[in-house]
Amino acid sequence: MRGSGTLRGVNEPAIRLTGLRKSFGALTAVDGVDLSIRPGEVVALLGPNGAGKSTTIDLALGLARPTAGSAELFGAAPRVAIREGRVGAMLQGGALLPTLTVAESVALVAAAHRNPLTVTEALERARCTEIARQRVSKLSGGQLQRARFAVAVVSDPDLLFLDEPTAAMDVEARRTFWRSMREFTEAGRTVVFATHYLDEADEHADRIVMMARGRIVADGTPAEVKAVVSGRRIRATARFAATPESQAALAALPGVRTADRRGDRVTLVSDDSDATLRALLAEHDIHDLHDIEVTVHTMDEAFLALTETRATEGALS
């Protein structure tokens, strides 16, 4: 990485997106995104397919023209930072020439930069040494992703964008990739990676920016994002009649955020499960409730709660 004292825009955010919007006809893919990322942060863009993650990365890189708003990298237009070799990218559609070997592909990109890593260094960083002589056309999906990573880091960038970097990788390949990534970020580089793997965002990001329907619906540390959907889920089989009055009584129990009944199955989401259970058992005879269970939210449930509920709330506000 270049000496930070000589870098243009050293006091600027690594990424600044302001009022960013991108529409394709009637479809709005990115809807008013404001985002500032400091140098040295490792940030996960988390969201379901169609959330706007890839389009946001394209806009940040200057690969697409925004309908409204602006994108800056290190205080300058994206093309400036890219031309200076300060930005690397590993994109889903990043094509490599099928007739070249992995080493030749890395060398081709290295030749376009002023102060690249050596080809050997880039291959080692991406754990590609053993496939260096293989042609791109012969690579498996996971190997191809590693080759793309080698190409992305050969410029020795200060900022790296990764779009679904572990797609097509098996579990062991994913572990190997993230070991490489930890080595890359140890020098204080900035990394932004888009993913739908909840465990990757939780384990490897300093900060999670969650998107849904083109909007940011949560932004914070992994712990802060998960805390937004804190609480427990209480399920029970109910023998008492399902009436509007009984439903209202369930919803009014202390700590309850949502109350749902389908047939004889009652599901409550509570911020204080102990208080909810005490009140529930006080209001109903023990014989009216069976198969009571209390569970914590799974990460999948947290993800769904934020990407569905928050996006809807944002659209209505």
Predicted regions mapped to residue ranges:
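Conserved ABC transporter NBD signature motif
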Residues: G69-R83
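ABC transporter nucleotide-binding domain
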Residues: W178-S270
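Conserved ABC ATPase "signature" region
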Residues: A107, A111, P116-I131
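Catalytic Walker B motif of ABC-type/P-loop ATPase nucleotide-binding domains
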Residues: L160-E164
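Short, charged/small-residue-rich alpha-helical element at the C-terminal edge
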Residues: G231-R310, S317
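Conserved catalytic motifs of ABC-family nucleotide-binding domains
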Residues: D156
